[in-house]
Design a protein with these regions (language model features):
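Negatively charged
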Residues: 1-197
Length: 197
């Protein structure tokens, strides 16, 4: 099929006075919808000059791997995930890792019932102030933290602006790795972990 990409350029002035071109981007396909395969790992990684990403026309029904899907996309301020079908996804490791310009994420439509790996999922999302994950089904998750004695890990690691985090629905009965899960979340003042096993 055909992949279609629309974009709108705009000049942005940085705090140091320099300017650079940033883009808003929309993706679609024939009949308006673009169907993906099973592996979306790194699909939108390193989008440093894209501010807005509209994925409402992306059919994600068959994806099982969303690891690092938006990895280090530090320019992103907004992602439309309203039509994301995540019912077959097993791997969300590092999905939003390093999306340091995102101020918010609406994940209310996410079905995480098959996901086993959420390590680094929101790591270094340093601008996000609130995350409501009350709809997350984590009953099959085994990894939320660093499974190794070296390197980086932790589902919310260095989310330094995060003030509100709702993980009240988390089922951690199968989780083996939680180390560094909240490391560097220096703005969190309260956290309800009463359901954690």
């Amino acid at each position: 099929g055909t992949v279609m990409l629309w974009y709108t350029p705009k000049e942005v002035t940085s705090s140091d006075g320099s300017t650079k071109t940033m883009y808003d981007m929309w993706i679609g396909g024939e009949n308006g919808v673009l169907q993906t395969g099973t592996n979306a790992s790194g699909m939108f990684a390193y989008l440093t000059n894209i501010e807005k990403l509209d994925l409402s026309k992306l059919d994600t029904t068959y994806i099982t791997n969303m690891s690092k899907m938006f990895y280090m996309s530090s320019g992103l301020k907004s992602i439309d995930l309203s039509n994301f079908n995540t019912s077959n996804v097993t791997n969300m490791n590092g999905m939003f890792w390093g999306c340091s310009s995102l101020a918010s994420l609406d994940l209310k439509t996410f079905n995480t019932s098959k996901v086993t790996d959420m390590n680094n999922m929101f790591a270094e999302c340093s601008n996000i102030t609130e995350l409501d994950l009350s709809n997350f089904d984590t009953s099959n998750v085994t990894t939320m933290g660093n499974p190794y004695s070296y390197g980086y890990g932790g589902m919310f690691r260095n989310c330094k602006s995060l003030k509100k985090l709702n993980v009240s629905s988390f089922n951690t009965s199968k989780v083996k790795y939680m180390s560094n899960m909240f490391q560097g979340c220096s703005s969190l003042t309260s956290l309800d972990l009463s359901n954690f096993d």
